[in-house]
Design a protein with these regions (language model features):
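Feature marks short, highly hydrophobic, charge-poor N-terminal signal-anchor/signal peptide-like helices
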Residues: 1-7
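Gly/Ala-rich beta-loop-alpha elbow adjacent to hydrolase catalytic centers
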Residues: 146-150
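An N-terminal hydrophobic leader/cap segment in hydrolases
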Residues: 7-54
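Membrane-embedded segments
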Residues: 56-136, 140
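Short hydrophobic/aromatic-rich motifs at helix boundaries and adjacent loops
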Residues: 2, 22, 100-102
Length: 151
């Protein structure tokens, strides 16, 4: 076999191997959870309380909850794939400063929530957060806010 044909074979096999590795490790490449459970007051969000939601498959989800004042909306905050709620406290303080409510969800596998992240699981988690808010507020007062993975 000539050297250029050998080079093509090696390149194709290398590329195929890379694709196989990406397939096998896709979850590790997609989700970067911070698994530490941190109290909201310890991060500079003393107005928030920690609530535990239950997803439809039984996973326990940690969320930080600040009720809205008067007729203000509640923001359901769906974070990105890296870190946890503790890294977003400045944004949460800005959202709640004018009386808006907040429900900041830690997906499964993040921030003390049980389970491992997956696309199907995150959809269940988002539904649990919406159900929590909907049980307390009319739909017109619920605002969905997604960052990166949460969009």
């Amino acid at each position: 076999m000539t050297s250029w044909k050998w080079l093509i074979v090696v390149a194709v096999l290398g590329y195929g191997g890379l694709l196989a590795l990406m397939y096998v490790f896709q979850r590790a490449l997609m989700y970067f959870p911070d698994t530490a459970r941190v109290a909201p007051a310890a991060t500079g969000l003393p107005q928030a309380e920690e609530v535990i939601l239950t997803a439809s498959d039984g996973e326990k989800l940690i969320a930080w909850y600040v009720p809205p004042r008067a007729d203000k909306p509640i923001v359901l905050y769906f974070q990105g794939n890296g870190g946890g709620s503790n890294l977003r406290v400045d944004r949460f303080n800005r959202l709640t400063a004018e009386g808006n409510g907040l429900l900041a969800l830690s997906y499964r596998g993040y921030g003390g929530s049980t389970g491992k992240p997956s696309e199907e699981g995150l959809i269940r988690d988002a539904q649990a957060a919406y159900d929590f808010a909907r049980a307390r507020y009319p739909a017109k007062r619920i605002v969905l806010f997604g960052e990166s993975l949460g969009t």
